[in-house]
Amino acid sequence: MLGDYRSGKTAIFNEIVGRKFGSYTNPSTFDYFYKEIMVDNELVGCNIWDTAGHEKFTTNLNKSFYRDVNCCVLCFDLHFEDSFKNLNKWMNEFHSKCLENGLENMELLPPFVLIGTKSDIPRTDISISNERIEQWCKNIEGQGIIDKVHYFETSAKLSQNIIMPFNTITKLALNYSNSIQKIK
């Protein structure tokens, strides 16, 4: 999971692994959890990593964080402009680190899912509009790196729309892993 500091990554991470909102503290190191998710009547094991605030110290996470990744979750706070503006930075870092880890070209890059967090907070004039989010997705799709940006809005506080993005993430990761295995 990638995104700016305080963009809601840890709250989503904790919800998906069964820790309820507000009942946990932020870890001081990277957080990792293994979760089994049902996809097409098949139980799929997922390794989920959270940067746990390390991105506030550097936007250049160690390339080992990206090793053997099959999908990326990009998160931004629906109410914080900088976290939305920095999505390109996070996506570029993800792509460059994957290439550094041995992927041969851009066509082999793992897919990603975009999550807008804190959807429980009412939208205001300073919030990121749906139109801007749709435009960002179209721009990414237009670059030819990815066919479709899967976008979800979630609220960890209310446990809303947490499962659906991870079902999509798991399906994308499984498809990607299978296609990479065929190439190797």
Curated annotation (Swiss-Prot):
Pfam families: Ras. It comes from Dictyostelium discoideum (Social amoeba). Keywords: GTP-binding, Nucleotide-binding. The keyword Ribonucleoprotein does not apply. GTP binds at residues 3-10, 50-54, 117-120. It comes from the Eukaryota. InterPro entries: P-loop_NTPase, Small_GTP-bd, Small_GTPase. This is Ras-related protein RabN2. GO terms for molecular function: GTP binding; GTPase activity. The lineage of its organism: Eukaryota, Amoebozoa, Evosea, Eumycetozoa, Dictyostelia. One of its GO terms (biological process) is phagosome-lysosome fusion. Belongs to the small GTPase superfamily. Rab family. GO terms for cellular component: late endosome; lysosome; phagocytic vesicle. The gene is rabN2. A motif (Effector region) lies at residues 25-32.
